[in-house]
Structures are given as C-alpha cells and as structure tokens.
Amino acid sequence: PSRGLGDVYKRQNKYHLQDFSVDDNGMYSFVTRLQNESGGEVSTDLKPGVANSGDRRFYFQAIMDYNRTFGKHDVNAMFIYNQDELVTQLFSGDLIAALPKRKQGVAARLSYAYDGKYLAEVNMGYNGSENFAKGHRWGFFPSIAVGYNISEEAFFEPLKNVFSNMKIRASWGLVGNDNIGGARFVYMPTINLTGTGYTTGLDGDITYKGPVYSRYGNPEVTWEVGKKVNVGLDLQLFNSLNLTMDYFHETRTDIFQERGTIPQYLGTAGTKVFGNLAAMKNQGFDFAADFNKKIGKDWFISFKGTFTYAHNEITKYDESPKYAFQSKVGQSANIPSIMISDGLFKDPDDVKNSNQQIGGNLSAGDIKYVNISKLYGYDDDIVDISDWVWAKNPTVPEIVYGFGPSIRWKNLDFSFFFQGVAKVSLVMSDFHPFGDNSLRNVLTWIADDRWSPDNQNINATYPRLTRDTSVNNTQRSDYWLRNAAFIKLKNAEIGYTYKNMRFYVSGMNLATFSPFKHWDPEQGGGNGLKYPTQRVFNFGFQMTINNNR
C-alpha cells in the first residue's frame, strides 16, 4: 500500500507586553515593549506604531510512503518535498533582515530487510539554500546503513544461552550545513554608504564620508559538508545485560570562515572576506549498558551506565599566527588560549629586571608571565600579550558519563544516578568570583589568601588587590585556568508501596564533587554570577485506582 500526505502551515506572531520602570523618585511608569517569538526585546520606543516586530512563516511539506511485506522480504520507501519561507517584520532600517528567508528540498528513503537478519537503508537529501549563489545553491547528501543480526542465524543457536542477541551495524553518509554565522547573501558584497572618512584640501582640513566595502562578495561559497562513519555492536547477554558500543568518525570540510591570510597592504583593511576555508575531524566512541535482573521472589536489580568520549581537531584553518606554535591547526575547536604564569613578582627589583609589558604599572604581587616566544626559539626578550599558548583541555568536556542503580526489595525501592564529565577546563574571566576585579566586594577567603606586604608569598592563590582593574592580572592565563571535571549525584529517590499507594522522597542536584570549588563547574567560566543550579527535594505519594469489578 502507498499513501500521501500534504501539509501547509502558516504562523504569525506578535508579542505586546506591559512593563514598568522606576525613576529616581520611586515613581512607576508603565511602558509598552514589543518582543519577537524568541523573547528578545525589539524596542522600548514609547511611540505607538513606530516599534513593531513579528514574523510570518509559510511551510509546505508533502510526504508519500510505501510499505510492503512479501514472504521474508520487507520493503519501505518514502519521498518528502518541503519548502520554507520566513519573513521577519522589522522596521529598524535593516533591509537585508527584512527579506524573506527561503529553503527548499527533497528527501527520499529506501529500506529493506530479509528475514530479520540482513538490513539495509539508503537515504538521500537534495537541498537548496538562499545563502549561496546559483551553481552552488544545491547540495546532494546521500547516506547508507547496513545491519546484520547474527543471532538470527541457525549456526548461532548453541550460543544463545549466553549471547541472547547480537547485531552488527555500520553506516556512512554526508550531511550539509548552510549556517554561515547569521550572515546572508555572502556571495554578494555589502557597501557602507557612510563609511570611513577621508580628508582633502590644501591643509587637509576637509573631511568627507563615502561608500566603502564592509564585506567582499564570494560567489564560490557553498555548503559545508560533513562525512560521517559509524560502526556499532548491539549485544545482549543472559537475557539480562544489554550492551551498545559505537565508534564514530566525522570529517567536516568547506567550513565557512573569515579569511585571515590577506595582508593589509592589499587594501582590504577591515573589510571582511569569507570562504569555505576550514576543516576539522571528530572521532570517539559511545558505550551504554543496561542490566535488569529479578533475584528470587523479593529482589529486583537494575543498573544503567553510559560513557562517551569525543575529540575534535582542526585540520585546516586560514590564519596568520604571529608564531607557528599558535596555529589552530591540530587544536580542538574549544581550546582556550592562555598565558603561562611564573608566580608573582617578589619585590621591586624583580619587576625592574623584567621585560614584561602587559599594561599598567607593575608592582610586587602582580602576576609574572613566562616569555613563551623565547622558549620556542624566537629572538624576543619582551613579554607581552602575544606570549600565549593553547591550554591542554577544552571548555567543552571530551568525556561524559553517567551511572546508577535501581533496587527493589519487596515493597521498598531505591534508586540514584550519578552524572560526570572529564577532560574539561574553565577560565575564571574575572579577578575573583562574584566581584568586579577591584577592591569592592572581595570575599574574605580571597582577601586572606592574596599577596600583601604582610604575606609576600609569590605562590599566593590571588595576586595583590588593586583599586582599579589590573590589566596585567586579568589576562587570560593558567593562573585563572581551572580543572572543571565533576561528578554529580543528579537524582535519588526512595519509595515504599502499600497496597495501591506509593510514598516517596526524591531529590535532584544533591551533591557535586569537583576540584573546582567556587561555583557549579557545569556553568563554565566567567565570574560565577550565572543563575545557580537549584537543589530540589520532593515529597509525595501516588495512588492507583482500579475501576475493574
């Protein structure tokens, strides 16, 4: 049998909210704010009709599928056509943003299975995006997946007492990405009609503004392409333990990037030039375990665990680093750049003998930095902000894991789940937590462990305090780099069932164990002023009502 399905969808949203403001005399004044669908404020202009925001979306999708089983053969096919148009109504003078955003594409899938043993599926997508010029607008993205249920073979029957199920999987495919960082129509140049001024006249006293390029067009820009390969194994042991293992590898090419190798003497100056210039790879493995077992009459035990390792690496990047060791090639996408500290300046003579030129007047108790360029063999005696290296671990974890049991004994049940990450770092971007880089709002334990005339420890946890922000001491460096690995008791619950009622106590975010103590490391770097993670406790009961007589 076959069937068809058509869809036409239109949506228009505008948000008008009443809010109030308070002046210096404590008087409240109500104002009207207009917001777009995502909640972002568009305007605070009080003139009705001047500020306006909304969107209109037209989405059309048609689906046709086919399913048939004959003998030991199962065949499924599907064809999809879709097109999408989004019009954002903004009266802010941004003509490009007001133009409709359009996409169009077709997709197809064909799957086949024989006797539940041999599985195959082929997919394809042919998609068009307005972001690219004619000739580069459409991308073709096929994929194929195969599977083999070994445990369904007759020769596997003697092993089923141990290996209840075994399946091998593999897939290969291409995926496309037309997201070019929010920019539109990059194949065409953009011109600023009131650009950089130039002077003329005999005395150079006449200044004019004129049109300048703010972005050069690149008609060759096209889709970013990711090639994905996956190999997996599904295994069940003793009808109780389910294991899933996957290895994945992805290479991404033609990544959209601004050029970094055009010298300024060519006249581009601050004008942007974009292209499909970068590439990277990502690989790792996933592991999941699920165990369920009833023991005797009264016991039931369940355990779940997951583990994922993923590492990405930039393999191509258009750049012109000052030093070769600062190239992004070979680094992870989320690795922070940091200066390397060498403790604190000991005394005025230590400062005087230093060639450190970071900014501001240096003093004893300020952070002392390593001359990285000289360590790499460059003839440079000056320590400045260009003396940086890449950190060891990224700010996005490479290892993510979780585990926890669920145990039931008679009418009593208990469960908990731990979640953790590893190989991750964070950078405290401000001088100290919950503060503003100066003497104000300094926590006691920071003040007690800082460098001071009474505590001239060059390895103090915090440098000297300053009345104003210290440019030298607030550089992104390993002085503020922290290990952000953690393991959390994400949730726990204990319950008791009596007849048709279950009473329980549960909690979420109950405990965090981490070498980083200042705030929840899951929030990442900064100064800790993000909304804190809530610890939640629940007490309740559940009642089952059976209407059967």
Feature-to-residue mapping (PLM):
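Single conserved hydrophobic/aromatic residue that forms the stacking wall/gate
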Residues: 1-9
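Conserved small-residue
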Residues: 184, 292-395, 435, 455
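Extracytoplasmic gating/loop element in the C-terminal half of outer-membrane beta-barrel translocons
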Residues: 27-30, 421-507
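C-terminal beta-signal and terminal closure region of outer-membrane beta-barrel proteins
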Residues: 274-282, 327-350, 455-457, 461, ...
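Outer-membrane beta-barrel transmembrane domain signature of Gram-negative proteins
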Residues: 20-121, 129-133
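Solvent-exposed loop/turn elements at secondary-structure boundaries
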Residues: 90, 157-225, 244-280, 324
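Transmembrane beta-strands of outer-membrane beta-barrel pores
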Residues: 10-14, 81-89, 124-130, 150-152, ...
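Outer-membrane beta-barrel signature, preferentially recognizing the C-terminal barrel domain
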Residues: 99, 195-242, 271-296, 332-340, ...
